[in-house]
Structures are given as C-alpha cells and as structure tokens.
Amino acid sequence: MYVPEEIIETVRMIEYQHLDIRTTTLGVNLKDCADKDLDLLKENIYDKITSLGGNLVETAEKVSQKYGIPIVNKRISVTPIGLIIGSTLKGLNEEESVDACVEVGITLDKIAKDVGVDFIGGYSALVHKRATPEEKMLIRSIPKLMTKTDKVCASVNVATTKSGINMYAVKKMGEIIKETSECTKDAIGCAKIVVFCNAPEDNPFMAGAFHGPGEGDAVINAGVSGPGVVRAVVEKLKGKDIGTISEEIKKTAFKITRMGELVGREVANELNVDFGIVDLSLAPTPAPGDSIANILEAMGLERCGTHGTTAALALLNDAVKKGGAMASSYVGGLSGAFIPVSEDAGMIEAVEVGALNLSKLEAMTCVCSVGLDMIAIPGKTPASTVSAIIADEMAIGMINKKTTAVRLIPVPGKDVGEYVEYGGLLGTAPIMEVFEFSSEEFINRGGRIPAPIQSLTN
C-alpha cells in the first residue's frame, strides 16, 4: 500500500528532479541473417529488426503514458556486425569490402529511421586479442560510415582482463577517430564511436551498445537516470556523516531501479520478447541540476575535480550499485555513474574554472563507469596521442577487472578554451588540454600487452 507521501515524492522526482527512464533498448540477434550475398544480408537484417522492433517506439510511449514516467530514448542494439559479415566479404578486395560494410551500416541507419528509434548500435568489432580480416575491414570503414549515416553507433572492444590489450587495435582506433573527426562536421562522428575494455554484452546505452553473442534472440534492456534525484537527497544531508549519505543514496537508487525494472518488463511483455537487465548507471544530461558533478559538490566539494573528488565519486558509485542490486534480480550493462563532460553542466563548469582536467577525469574512471566520455580535445592532437589516451584507459579497465571506455572528439580548428556545440543530449564540449609530449614511439611498437596476473582466476 502506497502512502500519499510516497506518491508525492515520485511526482516530485519526475517533475522537478528530471527522473526518467533514459532508454529502453531492444537487443536483436543477427547471427541467422548472415549470407554470402550482400543484398540478401541487408534484406535479412532489415526484415528481422523491423519485425521485432517495428512497434518499439509506440509500445514505449504507451507504457510511458500508462505509468506517467518519461522514457526519453528508444534504441536498438544488434549482434556485432564484425561477427556476421565474414562470408559476405569473401573474394572482395579491400575497397569493395569497406564499401560492403558501409552498405550494411546504411541499412541499419534506414531501419533506425523507419522504426523511429534514436540510435542503433552494434556496428562493432570484438578484437581484444586479434582482428579477423572482416573485422579489420569493418574498423577501416567506420569514418566513411559516419559520413553517410545519422543514427548508427560504432564500438570496438580492444582489451579484456583475460586477454590483455591489443595494441595494434589501439593504434588503429586512434587513427580512425582522427580520420572521422576530419570528415564529419565538428567531428560529430566521433561522438558515435566508443573504444572499450571489457565491453558488456547487454549495455542499453549508446554509443557502446551491442547485442552480445551470448544473448538470446531478442531482449529489452532498460537504462535509468536520476542524478537530479540523488542530488536533491544529498543536499538535505548537510552536516551528516558519510555513512548517512551512503545509506540515503542506496535508498534512492532502490526506488529509481524499481521503476526501471517495472517499465522494462512491461515493454518487453508488450513486445513479446525477453526482459534482460536494468542498467543502474546514473546518466546526466545538460539540463540544470541533472548533473553528477553537482552531486559530488553537494557532498561538500567546492568544485568537482578538486581533491576528494575521486573518493566522493567512489562513495556515490558504490551506494548506487548496492541500492540498485537490492531492487532488481537482473542488473547489468555498465551500472555505475557516468562522467561525460559535454553532457553534464556541472562538469563543464568545473573545466571552465580549471578544477577538472583530463588527468583527474582519468583518475575518476578508476572508481566509476564508464571512462573518458564525450571529451573534446584540440584538433591538432596527433593520432598517436589519441591512441595513447585510449591505451591508458584500457589499462585501468584491464587491471581493475572493470569496463572502461573512451569517446574522444578531436575537433578540427579548435584549441583549448574554445567550445564545440552539439545541442540536445550531447550538449556543449569545452576543448580540454592534452599533453604535447609524444607517445608515438610507444604506440608504434604494436603487439599485445599481456593479460595481468589478476586474470589467472581458475
């Protein structure tokens, strides 16, 4: 039985504190779509996704209205294209292979537009040990894909705790990100490319979502959001000790996750597909008050990025996980606190006043998900430096047995102190400083960083 206070609290969360379901993502298996003929492959992909997801947007809107809970994004993730395109590329030269990969990406883009979803993810390759010939072609095709599509997201897993770090792939992804930045307006294509260590197979969030090879035929994964709610709770706890803050965040995360599970299961039931997981991640937006940085500042930091920030973030991340895990039997995805610079008004302010830099963000990624996210850097940054930043972040994930990722945006013609404006959820990104000392010789060595001793768990 709900008491009036709880009902009013929920209304307040939604109306004033930006509580919403950030995404309901339909994961679709495409392994049965593989074909030697490119046209048949595209037809199979189109038919399967539209038959399963044709009503996704309409269903999510109906569930949203039923419960009065906003569902901000409706998305689709698919089996990594690198796993299904091999037979199609047999006998083709490199240029033809790249073009064939791009054609599949264009088909995904058409599906996203026809179905009405915000993004479609899964233009992906899993190359944490080595890349197959078709995966190399897929990776090579990413910049061209980004010039020809609007809604397709690409991701590449270059490292795992069990396999180590594929430094050939790290080097290549630095080059791909640089090339993409130069051929898309304001480097917007880079906002749709993620490089992973320990990529989860059931992530509902873009740009890194794909439907993992261990997943079933179709599944709904839900991602919740609620930084504004958590901030409001923490602001009421002035003078209270850290344990009290942790306890109250846990209680709040429980309520948020319960809501996510309710909505996710309802959408899955309506679409007649399995319910997968709830991703517990606190995902900020550029809206005032909907900020991870503001939560940390409410704990007593003058500015996010000052000394104590990593400890405060660790507290937040752990409390959210504990509260969320109690609320749902099936927790997955990234499940932590996101710290994307361009999508968080508090982070942007911290960069502007000099409290937050790239090195501090890297330290913060040791205790939260997911990594160096939506960070704009000078357009003159060489590809080897982009690769080196990726390598550092992959090492953090590999050693700590956690997911880490990099979404860097080298913006042509922009330098430190300037901004790039994307609008909407992607927000505004201040150009952040990177070291000018070279990492080129290290990156050019290639090879594979061996898996750490922590990987020997059997």
UniProtKB/Swiss-Prot annotation:
Any Pfam family hit: DUF711
Signal peptide extent: none
Superkingdom of the organism of origin: Archaea
Annotated HAMAP family: UPF0210
Annotated family: Belongs to the UPF0210 family.
Protein's name in the database: UPF0210 protein Mevan_0738
Organism (species): Methanococcus vannielii (strain ATCC 35089 / DSM 1224 / JCM 13029 / OCM 148 / SB)
